[in-house]
Amino acid sequence: YKARIDIVFSVDSISEYVEGVHFPKYLSKEVIRITKLLRSNGLSIRYNIVVTRLNQSEVRSLVLKAIDELDVNVKLLDLNKFSEYFGYSNKVSGEAAYKLWEELFISMSNFYDFLSEISNYSESEWTTQLISKGNGIPMSCYFRGNNWIQVKDSTRGAKYSEYCISNCLLYKTGNCQEGVFSLFLSSNMVLHLSGCKNTSLQYNLNGEEGWQIKRAFENLMELFK
């Protein structure tokens, strides 16, 4: 099973504080310790880095540290536009949420030259080769040694499954930017689709029997057919 899964950490900075702003998802000693332990047991690790104007100064160093020192893969993501954010201090919604997104959003194009310089080669349509019917955002990938850096650039658009188009209110109201593209089991044992906020497609597996867990996986896999 080790070859078929990634264990994902959200790591947005090297420092706990950047420009006076607290980043709870930083590369702490505990994250490093757990990363090394999992890698020593042959498990694939990925760091998800959400890039904003606040942490952009640390992104390049964080990418190199993750790959060269910790032997993990990286996924760079731009900031999704949501109607609600918890922000860096207070919960904001509506117009305030949109203004926060405008203030923090930074295009992934700012990092393409850097990624080209540090990589051996790249593929612009990497993820669409791995996903049934090419759903989701077409993500590019840059390879460095044995590891890779995947880039989610929302400006490239997304391909949505028939389920999204026909049944999902988030899609119909323009509040989904990613569509259906991969299964994700969170640390709280909730099985869902990566990037998907549709609660009807979330399964709490805590205390479930084996047949119930299997059925949850099968139900979500149906969306890829």
Question: Which positions does each model-derived feature cover?
Answer:
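Conserved SAM/AdoMet-binding glycine-rich loop
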Residues: 1-17, 33
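Structured loop/turn residues at beta-strand edges in well-structured enzyme cores
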Residues: 2-3, 69, 178
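Short, surface-exposed linear patches
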Residues: 7, 28-33, 172, 206-207
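A structural signal for short, well-ordered beta-strand segments
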Residues: 7-9, 47, 195
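Short coil/turn linker and secondary-structure boundary residues
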Residues: 14, 26, 106, 196, ...
